[in-house]
């Protein structure tokens, strides 16, 4: 459950280390984002020679949440922290590698590239 001002780790090789959610996309009154939702983020911490710089604003898709996501069979998939993957204007991943597991809920037409790059799909 990600809301405005939430800090997230970055699960790709763009050079960003941590980001902060500045907007949850999908409606003017929408407050929370879960796995698979697109948010606007500001880069808060970045590697010196990465693709992105501190202070830049990007779209990102949430790939892991500590709150977890409930499946149809009643199971709950939780993670130790919150993580996102940075996207460009066409909602394609900027990085070429994904670190850590992602959930099966990302397996939609929009985010198949992220699922194929991920080392593990839960």
Swiss-Prot record:
Q: Which UniProt keywords apply?
A: Ribonucleoprotein, Ribosomal protein, RNA-binding, rRNA-binding
Q: Which Gene3D superfamilies match?
A: Ribosomal protein L14 (2.40.150.20)
Keyword Ribonucleoprotein (UniProt): yes
The cross-references to InterPro entries, in alphabetical order and at most eight, read:
Ribosomal_uL14, Ribosomal_uL14_bac-type, Ribosomal_uL14_CS, Ribosomal_uL14_sf
A GO MF annotation of the entry reads:
large ribosomal subunit rRNA binding
Any one Pfam family here would be: Ribosomal_L14
Gene Ontology cellular component terms for the protein in this record: cytosolic large ribosomal subunit
Q: How does it assemble?
A: Part of the 50S ribosomal subunit. Forms a cluster with proteins L3 and L19. In the 70S ribosome, L14 and L19 interact and together make contacts with the 16S rRNA in bridges B5 and B8.
What is this protein for, i.e. what is its function?
Binds to 23S rRNA. Forms part of two intersubunit bridges in the 70S ribosome.
Family per record: Belongs to the universal ribosomal protein uL14 family.
User: How is this protein named in the record?
Assistant: Large ribosomal subunit protein uL14
Task: Give the species this sequence originates from.
Answer: Polaromonas naphthalenivorans (strain CJ2)
């Amino acid at each position: 459950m990600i809301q405005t001002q939430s800090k997230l780790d970055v699960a790709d090789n763009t050079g960003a280390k941590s980001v902060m959610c500045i907007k949850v996309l999908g409606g003017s009154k929408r407050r929370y984002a879960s796995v698979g939702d697109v948010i606007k983020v500001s880069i808060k911490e970045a590697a010196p020679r990465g693709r992105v710089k501190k202070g830049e604003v990007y779209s990102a898709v949430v790939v892991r949440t500590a709150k977890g996501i409930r499946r149809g069979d009643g199971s709950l998939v939780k993670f130790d922290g919150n993580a996102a993957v940075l996207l460009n204007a066409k909602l394609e991943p900027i990085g070429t590698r994904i670190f850590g597991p992602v959930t099966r809920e990302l397996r939609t037409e929009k985010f198949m590239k992220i699922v194929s790059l991920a080392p593990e799909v839960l």
